[in-house]
């Protein structure tokens, strides 16, 4: 079993700490659908088209198609767009 790095509880993707072959069990109860290169993102849950993609607990992109758990998340299925953000200042 391979262990994926999840950086924040809000994250719906994890990071591959090494190359992960297709069809391998990984933690979080999923199997890799694709080959996932070292350092790349893998979906930890179903992400619908138009949903935000979270890493570090922050929005890093928007899915441009449905993404299944275990699927490689990269420029082919993730895009960027402007959206309203809320900022919290700590004084």
Report each predicted region and the residues it spans.
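Short acidic DE-rich linear segments
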Residues: 90-91
